[in-house]
Amino acid sequence: MHLPSLSVALALVSSSLALPQAVLPENDVSSRAAAVKEAFSHAWDGYMKYAFPHDELLPVSNSYGDSRNGWGASAVDALSTAIVMRNATIVSQILDHIAKIDYSKTSDMVSLFETTIRYLGGMLSGYDLLKGPAADLVEDRTKVDMLLQQSKNLGDVLKFAFDTPSGVPYNNINITSHGNDGATTNGLAVTGTLVLEWTRLSDLTGDQEYAKLSQRAESYLLAPQPSSGEPFPGLVGSAISIQTGQFTNGFVSWNGGSDSFYEYLMKMYVYDPKRFATYKDRWVAAAESSIDHLASNPASRPDLTFLATYNKGSLGLSSQHLACFDGGSYLLGGTVLDRADLIDFGLKLVDGCAETYHQTLTGIGPESFGWDEKSVPADQKELYERAGFYVQSGAYILRPEVIESFYYAYRVTGKKQYRDWVWNAFENINKYCRTESGFAGLTNVNAVNGGGRYDNQESFLFAEVMKYAYLTHAPGMSSMPAAAEDKANKSRG
């Protein structure tokens, strides 16, 4: 929310992405990649020991949580990274688990959004990889075919959520009673971060129902009504009426709640340029409008650039870790469209988010931050003057977005600086978040030792943080076709 973050990248990055030039000696690159693989295995081993087959490890108390309906979210979300790392043992464990999941059974409400990006996206990306560049990793092909069947099973369980007057789905649903939470609106990111996975499911199965459902919901976002729902070309509000499909506000943001809608626009175009040219046009409009209307430079650090929010004629000078995928989105779009101006702006956004890491005591960025010089807390004036931002929420819950954008910057430019930024971020996460059994979130990234620890290891640690850190340093990865490489990446989401 990706909340995202996260987004799932079944999208294929164009082969026009510049392949990075090796700067470190090969043995140094290999040692970094090995360190990331060790951290992944450490988190996986703790999960298997204390939490499997539940959703997530509680890495402080060495227990388990079931925040994602008890279907084993960490296992499913970890699949594509285990494949990229070529860890056949873990891949086999995950495939055996997925085969046993009954997606029709849970005692809790189901989030259509979270279930799509973690479970459906995890299975489909694993399927594509094991059918393609990693086909040699699993001998029993029936286990690979099972991934698609389970994806279809899950889609069939969830699809009633779209049965509304407009086709805009409910997000929080009861799969047993086919009920919902009674919401009257759905969020921009929640509605707009389904279409890639559901379209891919249709393309793989030949059943067009999944694509039609998700694309009908998306259609309201591509042609927003009323006009107040689109304050600037391409930039739309954050809530949509489930009854009518009309926008109910004009609050514009790249933050959580809106973020991955913009992420998926470009990824849909990359996935299939012929079918989804309109998505590209809407992304370009949003990207250009953001440069014109949302780009903001802190008074104390005018060299930095962030994207502000907008509501009813006013800019909000605050942002989130979640929004830091924005640099990567600009870099992807700029590269695919051969737009140097968008690449340059994307690198500015990457540099801005990099400072939120470089300037804290832990070297890890906060959940949210601001740069309004009129609202600087008294105890953060020195930080604001030096760094160009102040911390609003100092939490870090193992989010991937900053490392994600560093990865894109390295892939697009080949500059060592961005690879080193990925490594530094990984080292700090390994230093401050690591526990005996896994990795825990931090309560305050700008406190000594990160303050306290949150007793939760989110599944996107496996799916995104470890994947981007590994792909940045993996020996020989630069020779892997860029399209196949990004097929393995799950982004905001």
UniProtKB/Swiss-Prot annotation:
Gene Ontology molecular function: any one: mannosyl-oligosaccharide 1,2-alpha-mannosidase activity
EC top class, as a word: hydrolase
Subcellular location(s) of the protein: Cytoplasmic vesicle lumen
SUPFAM superfamilies: Seven-hairpin glycosidases
Reaction equations catalysed: N(4)-(alpha-D-Man-(1->2)-alpha-D-Man-(1->2)-alpha-D-Man-(1->3)-[alpha-D-Man-(1->2)-alpha-D-Man-(1->3)-[alpha-D-Man-(1->2)-alpha-D-Man-(1->6)]-alpha-D-Man-(1->6)]-beta-D-Man-(1->4)-beta-D-GlcNAc-(1->4)-beta-D-GlcNAc)-L-asparaginyl-[protein] (N-glucan mannose isomer 9A1,2,3B1,2,3) + 4 H2O = N(4)-(alpha-D-Man-(1->3)-[alpha-D-Man-(1->3)-[alpha-D-Man-(1->6)]-alpha-D-Man-(1->6)]-beta-D-Man-(1->4)-beta-D-GlcNAc-(1->4)-beta-D-GlcNAc)-L-asparaginyl-[protein] (N-glucan mannose isomer 5A1,2) + 4 beta-D-mannose; N(4)-(alpha-D-Man-(1->2)-alpha-D-Man-(1->2)-alpha-D-Man-(1->3)-[alpha-D-Man-(1->3)-[alpha-D-Man-(1->2)-alpha-D-Man-(1->6)]-alpha-D-Man-(1->6)]-beta-D-Man-(1->4)-beta-D-GlcNAc-(1->4)-beta-D-GlcNAc)-L-asparaginyl-[protein] (N-glucan mannose isomer 8A1,2,3B1,3) + 3 H2O = N(4)-(alpha-D-Man-(1->3)-[alpha-D-Man-(1->3)-[alpha-D-Man-(1->6)]-alpha-D-Man-(1->6)]-beta-D-Man-(1->4)-beta-D-GlcNAc-(1->4)-beta-D-GlcNAc)-L-asparaginyl-[protein] (N-glucan mannose isomer 5A1,2) + 3 beta-D-mannose
Enzyme Commission number(s): 3.2.1.113
Catalytic residues in the record: 367 (proton donor)
InterPro entries membership: 6hp_glycosidase-like_sf (IPR012341), Glyco_hydro_47 (IPR001382), Glycosyl_Hydrolase_47 (IPR050749), Seven-hairpin_glycosidases (IPR036026)
Cysteine pairings via disulfide bonds: 324-353
One of the protein's GO biological processes: ERAD pathway
UniProt entry tagged with the keyword Glycoprotein: yes
Assigned protein family: Belongs to the glycosyl hydrolase 47 family.
Functional note: Involved in the maturation of Asn-linked oligosaccharides. Progressively trims alpha-1,2-linked mannose residues from Man(9)GlcNAc(2) to produce Man(5)GlcNAc(2).
Protein's name in the database: Probable mannosyl-oligosaccharide alpha-1,2-mannosidase 1B
Organism: Aspergillus fumigatus (strain ATCC MYA-4609 / CBS 101355 / FGSC A1100 / Af293) (Neosartorya fumigata)
Organism lineage: Eukaryota, Fungi, Dikarya, Ascomycota, Pezizomycotina
Gene that produces this protein: mns1B
